[in-house]
Amino acid sequence: MFAPVYFDHNATTPLDPRVLEGMLPYLSVQYGNASSRHEYGRAARRAIDEARQRVAFAVGAHPTEVVFTSGGSEANNLFIKGAAACLAPGTVAISAIEHPCVREPAKALQRAGWRLREIAVDENCRVVGADFKSAIDEKPALVSVMLANNETGAVQDVVALADHAKPLRAWFHTDAVQAFGKRRLDFRALNVAGVHAMTLSAHKLGGPKGAGALVVDKRVELQPLIAGGGHERGLRSGTENVAAIVGFGLAAELATEQLDARARQLEALRAELETGLVAQGARIFGGAAERLPNTSCFAFADIDGETLVGKLDRAGFAVAAGAACSSANQEPSHVLLAMGVEARFARGAVRVSLGNDNTAAQVRDFLGALNTTISQLKGLAALTS
């Protein structure tokens, strides 16, 4: 069977074979419930404890700060809704480029009587310092600014932002789902600066889908979204998905190995990609910002992104139009619109997100296929205009 070249690693990553191998016993012979008080249960509990230690070590946190969830979306909801439930309604401040699993719970708070304050970003997808300071002057009780954007790859200076917000004593959260595995994370340093919670997900770094974590300062009071047996420090009830959690721990450990060298390789591949894109007339979004090393978001004027992605798929290349989590939405990306990108470009946005197994030859082949496809689409447009 023909396998397209996979250039969509910000959507999900292939399961690392070493991770799968570590998970298999917990999908077969080690089937105990971690709450059971016999050896099967104790074995499951030991596996979860070891995975928790691995995740904590990978991000510079204490194991007791790691709360396992079903993924990044649940972890983001747990922080925003869970923290808000323990506070009187006030202001929640989020950046204008947050993932929907931050934006939507924030909007839910707005419907429940909270004030929602969106913080502006500039043309390179970076939080505007003056508007952030203005938002902080409004004394929000909750603040959430993502560490790295899933569409453009733009990285925020979360340490500086949290440090500025620190005197306010608001709970500060960062969604690090895209950053984890692509750059080094140090929750202890973030916490000292004023970050109280950080979201992670396993499937973005060679782990399984269905496992994530909220790394959270124990001073933060949260009301659980799921009530029940009091698992995960009472913050996330439900029988643990032992196999997925084990896989998460292994993926987290593996992601930190040779991270800097892998990042340099990905940056070099992206540089070759973007040189070719610019030569073909593409506009790169967020190119002047510090970005994740693997991510490039671009568009051609008046070329529909969904159409381009479909043709590239048929040519053997798997890329994304905007973000995979909202691909059913045909509206222009809220991220690009927040950056001030005109609709004629925003509707054409395509994201290439490279992975460790991608090669320079694949990038060159992609550029060739893209050039052919763009020529065809422009020719068709000329005939129908």
Named regions from a protein language model:
Residues M1-S385:
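Pyridoxal 5′-phosphate
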